């Protein structure tokens, strides 16, 4: 609602003369007031008229829109009825097509002979790749076996060489030892003889004998050095031979580790083959499930076709009955129906054209059904071929595993023979090498490790036997699954009959849906009329509510604007006050510092009592002002009268007098604390003001 009011009185000109009596002036003012009121009423009525006119035009437009919507709904109803009729005709055509497709599907059902041929083909296709793979694995195993035997032979050869060299070095050392011991004994005998001679011979002879002995000593020292060099060379050769033996042992250990790694890889391949076999079993199960699903679909389609064929027969029978009735009526009343003959002929032509269209549609649907059936047959054949291929693969794996078992048994026999031969060799070596007991102990430990490894290999062979038995059990379970597939085919034939019954039920549901659709249309028309009436009533109510809400909104908006302006003014005043107070605080702090310096100076000098009392009063006055200022800042919500309380003045005056004996640094700390409290208080005020402004802004929006 728009209401304009006059605020300027200058718009009404004053036509009366300036002079006159007081009665004339009073009547003139009353007349002007009446004129102003009349003009205000006119403008008010004008604004109301314009609003009513706008509402009238809007309502007319809405009325036109509703009429158009009604026409549109009526047209949609007609189109839906036409669509339902077309759907009926299409369903009849599909019924005929499905009957033909059913007959074709019956012809294309797999016989047991065809199934056996497919199984044989799948077995052949699955067996060939698996046989090749197991053959390759056997070749690799033989290759690794040959390498292992070669390494074992080299190891034994190197070991025998090492023992032979060790025995030679021991013999050489023993011979050298015996030789040196005999020489030392001979030298000691010579020494004793010389000593005896020295005791018996004169001094002249002694000098000659000493020289001769010195020469012999030099010769013997040289000979000793030569022997030591030979011993060092022998030691070096011994160390080199030991290093070579250690290198050979390391190489053999490395080769053994590689062989163990190859054995582990072969075991891993075996496990992967087992996993593949399990996966193939799962795939066989999934293919059988798909086969059952497809057969269920086939049975459903057959049931639908049967139901549709029964419907077609009923329709044909009804059509025949109608034609016979028409013929009887035409025979009885030819004179009466001569006028209507042309109409009936035209209707017959239309029916014939419709029949031709339906026939064309039926042929098209037949072609589509044939294609779908072919695709289904292909899928079923592909699934069966995959199942047979998996069976063949499993049989190949079984054969390969049996061959591998035989090889492992042969290896076990060879290992037993080799172990016995090694035991004999070690017993001979133990008898021959009693001098090197520590070395033989180490070798015995290595032999024990090898024996443990052989025992482990035997256990692995037994495990493989158990796995082969498990595979045989799996093959038997797969054969059982094949028999279950044959049973599932019989179940599918039974499910076809169930599908036919489902089609009949669906027909009945279609009829029910049609009747429900007609009822829903009638109810929709009634509800439309009722909703239109309700809509018009609600429209008037909404217009009234909108006007009330707009007025309330304008009032609230004005209030918010005023509150925001007042808040801004308060904030600016508060900030100015804070600035002034901060300046005062700084001035007071400066004065306080000056007074403290003066106090210190006076304390140093002998100040008279009058000056001291005067300064003390001045300090009390400054401290009182400072406390008042602090109470104003720290407690801003207190009324101004409370801050000018004489009791507070007395207490504030008393406190500084009590605090005078404290040192200045304590007063500075207290002052800094008060300033920090002030800052915190100011920050809290700012945050509260911001929150209030945000709340006002959100409510205004």
Curated annotation (Swiss-Prot):
GO terms for cellular component: centriole; centrosome; ciliary transition fiber; cytosol; Golgi apparatus. Changing residue 511 to P: In NPHP18; does not interact with CEP164 and IFT20. Keywords: Ciliopathy, Cilium biogenesis/degradation, Coiled coil, Cytoplasm, Cytoskeleton, Disease variant, Nephronophthisis, Phosphoprotein. Residues 1-23 are annotated as: Disordered. It is found in: Cytoplasm, Cytoskeleton, Microtubule organizing center, Centrosome, Centriole. GO terms for molecular function: identical protein binding. One of its GO terms (biological process) is establishment of centrosome localization. It comes from the Eukaryota. The modification Phosphoserine is found at residue 698. Residues 40-634, 665-698 form a coiled coil. Residues 1-14 have a biased composition (Polar residues). It is linked to Nephronophthisis 18: An autosomal recessive disorder characterized by chronic tubulointerstitial nephritis resulting in end-stage renal disease in early childhood. Extrarenal manifestations, including intellectual disability or liver changes, may occur in some patients. Component of the distal appendage region of the centriole involved in the initiation of primary cilium assembly. May collaborate with IFT20 in the trafficking of ciliary membrane proteins from the Golgi complex to the cilium during the initiation of primary cilium assembly. Interacts with CEP164 and IFT20. Belongs to the CEP83 family. This is Centrosomal protein of 83 kDa. It comes from Homo sapiens (Human). The lineage of its organism: Eukaryota, Metazoa, Chordata, Craniata, Vertebrata.
